[in-house]
Amino acid sequence: MVFAAPCWVPPLPSDLPDSTTLEEFIFCQVKDSQTRSELDRSILICGTQGKEYTVQESMERTGRLAQGLSAWLDWPQKPSEEDWKVAAIFNINCVEFFSISHAIHRLGGTVSAINASSTADELEAQLRLSNAQAIFTCNTLLKIAMKASQKVGIPLANIFLTDAPGSYRPDDVYPFQEIDNIVRTARSSLPLLQLGRGQGSSTPAYICFSSGTSGAQKPVLLSHQGIIANIVQINTFEKFRQKGPNVSLCILPLAHSYGLVCVAYNALYRGDRLAVLPSSDVEDLLSIVEKLRINTLYLVPTLLSRILSGGKAGGHDLSCVKEVYTGGAPLHPMLGEHILRHHPTWKTKQCYGATEAGTAVSVTSDCDLWPGSVGCLLPGVQAKIIRSDGSETTKHDESGELWVSSPSLAIGYLSNPLATEATFTVDNTGRTWLRTGDEAKICLSPNGNEHLFIVDRIKDIIKVKGFQVAPVELEQLLLSNDFVEEVAITSRQDKRGEERPQAFVVRTHEGLKEPQDAVSESLQALVKARKARYKWLHPHVIFVDSLPKTTSGKIMRRALRNMCPANSEVNGRLSSKI
């Protein structure tokens, strides 16, 4: 049984551009649809420094940056699989992200978006996986970028700086090039890249990292046409909702496909002004919402919880807020109930997607709000629910693995055909399906609309603050400790009701000689030293005599989760916090 968008959702246009870059699609349509006075209106706003760019300024800046980078990196303007050009953006959120990205795209290159919280080891791994030849970063992250680039062989000359604030500037070691200087000294402006017919679907625009259905981080190739398709899908679904240009806020990491596609590019396509904030500081967020009168927020549940906790929202005028979209992780029911009680005018809407899907798969509509649902399928998306025996479900309310097909699907994983083949499957009609690894079901709402519900994650990936954490990544690290014989990582809620990696450890003979607290502290310190903050362990390591396993030797993670304290106890503490 194949499911699709509700009948009241307009159909997806059949003429999605297949020879257009993202920059041309976003900015040229805005440029063509606006009056001269509107073209002088800012579309990009730096939320901290107040710097603004119009459509004209953004495209001119991009062209000059592309010209300068072409000469500096010796990159000709052409897309070519033989001449693979990849530049990594390892930076906090900033408005320069788009000029850099589009300049690389004008050169026929691909942008590898890397989370700013990555450690030097993690950055090194992702630079290798993406085959990056240049890095764009800021002063704050420069030391990490230098360490990782040295290990992968990227020359210091290929590290470029934005003007984000920071103190680490080893100019006495190397005079790093700044973006503003390249733009200022460029002799001309490089024009838009002209893709050939059909190249939009085969030319990667971005590499975003995902753990897929299992295993460590893998580079996902998102094409120009795939991202364009997802933007059109979202806007077609929300066509009846939009009432003229708005001010949107991007506080979610642009290295995450949710922040990149669903928030940033979606807003720019609508003609919104996009305010970009570099961090998830709650006070900064609330202040800019109040100042710019932002009425739609795109958040992850953990950030929403921080906004509502401790009465922080009470000190600001948030009467402008009408809608709150959450994605990246499930919305805790108690958090939804809190919003209903204290902010009844806010429409809280969940959405669902995956990096491999090109991001969004389903979105909640004003027409049919249903608590717990992640909304209705977007136009052009087809879904089916696959039972454990491989057969398709034939009715509503039956759970199984969610498979989706969409024009926005990723090209696949870079240089990993086995993982691509395992995740993307082609049926006998030639249609490609993404195996999401998520257990889901389709249910009919009281209004008769089909809604998607995510039941559980079949895959072992843990979601922390919207970011994916692969258990195997932490397990391999912990096994390097002399006190660890065996280890399994699963998920557990902390006292705030947020998901954290939970370690179950079988100690070695040497480990048994040490106090449990000492071993626990050793393991916590190891993870904190080597991994990003969102990968840090739950404070309480659980020590066991053995790990529950199947007859084939596979760890039974669900049995381990059942050994954790009951969620009801955790939830009770959460309710006292907000």
Curated annotation (Swiss-Prot):
GO CC term, one of those recorded: peroxisome
UniProt motif (Peroxisomal targeting signal type 1) ranges: 576-578
Gene Ontology molecular function: any one: ATP binding
InterPro entries: AMP-bd_C, AMP-bd_C_sf, AMP-dep_synth/lig_dom, ANL_N_sf
Positions of ATP binding: 210-218, 350-355, 438, 457, 554
Name of the featured protein: Acyl-CoA ligase AKT1
Mutant lacking the gene: phenotype: Abolishes the production of AK-toxin and impairs the pathogenicity.
Top-level taxon of origin: Eukaryota
Subcellular location: Peroxisome
Role this protein plays: Acyl-CoA ligase; part of the gene clusters that mediate the biosynthesis of the host-selective toxins (HSTs) AK-toxins responsible for Japanese pear black spot disease by the Japanese pear pathotype. AK-toxins are esters of 9,10-epoxy 8-hydroxy 9-methyldecatrienoic acid (EDA). On cellular level, AK-toxins affect plasma membrane of susceptible cells and cause a sudden increase in loss of K(+) after a few minutes of toxin treatment.
UniProt cross-references to Gene3D superfamilies, sorted A to Z: 3.30.300.30, N-terminal domain of ligase-like
Start and end residues of each stretch annotated as SBD1: 281-350
Annotated EC: 6.2.1.-
Keyword DNA-binding: no
UniProt-annotated stretches for the region SBD2: 351-413
UniProt KW keywords: ATP-binding, Ligase, Nucleotide-binding, Peroxisome, Virulence
Native source species: Alternaria alternata
Principal localisation: other
Pathway: Mycotoxin biosynthesis
